[in-house]
UniProtKB/Swiss-Prot annotation:
Ranges where the IQ domain occurs: 337-366
Composition-biased stretches (Polar residues): 1-17
Gene3D superfamilies documented for this protein: Phosphatidylinositol 3-kinase Catalytic Subunit, Chain A, domain 1 (3.10.20.90)
Organism: Macaca fascicularis (Crab-eating macaque)
Annotated Ubiquitin-like domain residues: 130-206
UniProt entry tagged with the keyword Ribosomal protein: no
Record protein name field: IQ motif and ubiquitin-like domain-containing protein
Entry keyword set: Cell projection, Cilium, Cilium biogenesis/degradation, Cytoplasm, Cytoskeleton, Flagellum
Region feature Disordered, mapped onto this chain: 1-49
Domain of life: Eukaryota
SUPFAM superfamilies linked to this entry: Ubiquitin-like
Length: 790
């Protein structure tokens, strides 16, 4: 027996139970190394001892990166050949028996038979093994084991279920992109014995049962014996340590054999890198305390001087004679420096003065240029306003334009009336007044003709806008700024009717094209039978008949206009065009319309609420917009265009502040007119400028929101200067401030009638103080009668 110690490495993978054959195969045993013996008898004794202990089974397996050995379950087969008595020999008993018996042929034959059976069992078990490289997904850890190709994969899954701590039903094995079932074997998928394959194990529920790394498999090693040929007939057994690690081998280069195709890597690729030792935590006083040490050190500087001496010649051709200069004292030195400083200061101040003057000159030129541009801008705006006024007079289109024309007519009539009253008397005056009345009548008739033309054009534009609104697709705006459009069956129907209406309204088309349009219209209208559709069909047949008889186009204008009008009524019917129901002024449900109509005492008509103009202070509804406009054209002939511009500019100014102001947007046209005329006298409070086109209404205190009691009427330039003030008390005199506050109190008294604005006024402490100061005691007095005592 050899006394050499056996080398064992710590086994990190837990062995499975001996009850299952597959688990014995998966088990990775502790490798052992057998010492070599020269004596043949001792070699057989060692074989018997190792066989009785059933620990040494050599399985040599080769892989690209790691090797593993699995212990075959040969114990049961060996028991059939050898009895328990023969297997349970101790080393001492065996030595005594060997000393008593002499070696003979029977014992040697028996040992050879045992060894042959053992080798045959090992070969039969090794032939059915395959090297399986298991990759854990998603951690990427690689584990190399040996597994029988004819064993069901349920045992492999049970093994890794025990290692990973994951239920068996959650784990899945994948090979070549296919999921392997529990009752399948590797042979069924074409895996042969002694073959190297790679499978992947992953979890079907990674959130609840994630696959993690197995830390116990990082340093598993094995020692095997390899026979190496050292000479012609010489062989030597070398112990090789195989380190199994999940370290991913990097490719650092190599070479490939052209004949055999074997790829050889460098040593750095085949060696696991050494671990960097972790730095120990140091928390002692030396690492947290700073010690300073200060030492002064003067280095030596060796110098030498060359001079003439015996045997040394130094040339003096380049030498020069230095004579001492004039000596001056410290006072003279400082006086000279002071003189130089004065010179520098003089030139610097001169340069600074030039720069300052040039800067002032440049600012002045910029200011003059800016003022010139502002004057030109004002002149340009004035000219544009005059051009717009002229265009409105000659091409009126909107109600504001006709309102402006009637205002100009009234202004002209007042001037002519004043001139006639000053120039004529008696019969001449009456004749001049009659002539003035006749001219006024002609002008009113001309304005009426322009109004009819504008009404016709506006009516066509309104119809087209109405049809565009009905046929428009549904639009949504996404958070990223893009728009989404969707067409419904109702919008598609509305678009088809709109296209037919446009074709009907086309002019200067041929007779065949007109017949095609009428035929399309006829097929569209035939879908519904009612009185309106029957009338449209009759008119279509009449036009076709007249066209076949050769009637000219200008004689068919009335008929075509009637067809277009009836077809527009067809489009406005919700039964034929469901999309139009959303845009009709008169709703289909009478109950909804009942609460929104009012009676006009002037035209005696019931109209919707949108046809009435209501001011902020009005409490009842008397006349509609048309009656008020008609009364203005007949009597006052006032123009509210400038007040509209003033109110619109106020809206824009308050919107730019972005401070959630509310009162300014509650103001109506009548309110801004009253505020301008009655409170501010239609002129600037600073310069008394009375042209409303140049006036704006801004905040008095810009830190508070605009209101009738926090505003001031100024020109545009004055408003810009007012808004630049940091303090009102510093910018204006006390008398002017008192005057403005008085106007604010007048505005509060007027607009306090509005319930919405009254809620803002009641919260003002200043108005409460004024009311308390002028409050009179109205409590009833109690007079007690005093009777004389009896």
């Amino acid at each position: 027996m050899s006394n050499q110690p056996k080398k064992y490495e710590t086994q990190n993978i837990a062995n499975s139970t001996e009850e299952s054959d597959a688990f014995d195969i998966v088990t990775i045993p502790v490798p052992s190394e057998e010492p070599q013996e020269s004596d043949q008898t001792e070699e057989h004794e060692s074989g018997i001892e190792q066989f009785s202990e059933s620990h040494a089974i050599h399985v040599e397996e080769q892989s690209d990166r790691s090797f593993s050995s699995l212990e075959p379950d040969s114990e049961q087969l060996m028991k059939e050949v050898i009895s328990p008595r023969q297997v349970s020999y101790t080393p001492q008993h065996h030595e005594k028996q060997y000393a008593m018996q002499s070696p003979n042929d029977d014992s040697l034959a028996f040992l050879d038979k045992i060894k042959a059976i053992k080798e045959s069992l090992q070969e039969s078990m090794e032939d059915s093994l395959a090297t399986v490289k298991v990759v854990l997904i998603p951690v990427g850890q690689e584990i190399v084991i040996s597994f029988k190709v004819d064993t069901v994969l349920k045992y492999l899954k049970d093994y890794f279920s025990h290692l990973l701590g994951i239920p068996l039903s959650v784990l899945q094995i994948r090979y070549s992109g296919k999921i392997l079932r529990n009752n399948e074997t590797l042979v069924q998928h074409g895996v042969k014995p002694q073959e190297i394959i790679q499978v992947e194990i992953f979890s079907t529920n990674p959130d609840l049962y994630p696959v993690k790394r197995i830390d116990g498999l990082t340093d598993v090693s094995q020692i095997i014996t390899v026979t190496v040929q050292t000479g012609l007939d010489r062989y030597q057994q070398v112990a090789v340590e195989i380190v199994k690690s999940d370290f991913h081998k990097p490719f650092l280069g190599g070479f490939r054999h052209k004949v055999t195709g074997v790829e050889y890597h460098h040593a750095g690729t085949q060696t696991v890198p050494k671990k960097i030792p972790e730095r120990l935590s140091v928390f002692c006083r030396d690492t947290q305390t700073v010690f300073q040490k200060k030492n002064l050190q003067q280095t030596t500087n060796t110098t030498s001087t060359q001079m003439t001496n015996i045997g040394v010649y130094v040339s003096n051709m380049t030498d020069k004679l230095v004579t001492p200069g004039k000596y001056f004292s410290a006072a003279e030195y400082h006086a000279q420096r002071l003189k130089a400083v004065i010179v520098i200061q003089t030139y610097y101040r001169q340069w600074h003065a030039k720069i300052f003057v040039e800067d002032l000159r440049r600012q002045k030129s910029l200011r003059l240029e800016w003022e010139t541009q502002q004057e030109l801008r004002k002149i340009r705006e004035k000219e544009e306003w005059v051009k717009l006024d002229y265009h409105r007079r000659h091409n009126p289109k909107t109600s504001e334009d006709f309102e402006f024309l009637y205002n100009a007519l009234e202004f002209w009539r007042q001037e002519e009336l004043k001139r006639i009253n000053q120039s004529f008397t008696g019969a001449e005056r009456k004749a001049a007044l009659c002539e003035l009345l006749e001219k006024e009548t002609q002008i009113i008739a001309s304005i009426g003709r322009h109004r009819y033309i504008a009404y016709t054009a506006n009516q066509e534009a309104a119809i087209q806008a109405f049809l565009d609104k009905c046929s428009a697709p549904k639009i949504w705006r996404t958070p990223n700024g893009k728009t989404i459009e969707m067409d419904t069956q109702f919008t598609i129907r509305a678009r088809e009717l709109q296209n037919i209406y446009k074709c009907i309204m086309l002019k200067n088309i041929s007779q065949d094209e007109r017949l095609d349009v009428l035929l399309t219209l006829k097929h569209t209208v035939k879908e519904h039978e009612c009185k309106l559709t029957q009338e449209i069909l009759e008119l279509i047949d009449r036009e076709v008949d007249l066209m076949m008889r050769g009637v000219k186009h200008h004689n068919l204008e009335g008929l075509r206009k009637r067809i277009a009008t009836l077809f527009f009524h067809y489009i406005k019917t919700p039964l034929f065009n469901p999309e139009v129901a959303k845009y009709l002024k008169v709703p289909q449900d009478p109950l909804k319309f009942y609460k929104k109509i009012y009676f006009c005492h002037s035209c005696q008509l019931y109209l919707p609420s949108t046809e009435f103009s209501i001011s902020s202070t009005s409490r009842r509804i008397y006349r509609c917009r048309n009656c008020i406009s008609l009364e203005n054209e007949a009597q006052k002939r006032e123009s509210f265009l400038k007040y509209r511009c003033l109110l619109q500019q106020l809206y824009f100014t308050e919107a730019d502040y972005e401070d959630d102001s509310k009162i300014a947007f509650l103001m109506q046209l009548q309110d801004i007119q009253y505020l301008t005329e009655n409170i501010w006298a239609s002129q600037s409070v600073l310069s008394a400028w009375d042209d409303l086109s140049d006036l704006v209404m801004v905040r008095w205190n810009k830190s508070l929101e605009w209101s009738p009691w926090n505003c001031i009427l100024l020109t545009k330039d004055e408003a810009a200067a007012h808004l630049n003030l940091t303090s009102i008390e510093e910018g204006y005199e006390r008398s002017f401030i008192h005057k403005i506050k008085h106007k604010h109190i007048l505005a509060k008294n007027y607009f306090s009638q509005i319930p919405v604005l009254a809620s803002f006024i009641l919260d003002d402490p200043e108005i409460d103080e004024i009311r308390w100061k002028h409050h009179s005691d109205t409590t009833p007095k109690i007079i007690e009668s005093q009777r004389p005592p009896p």
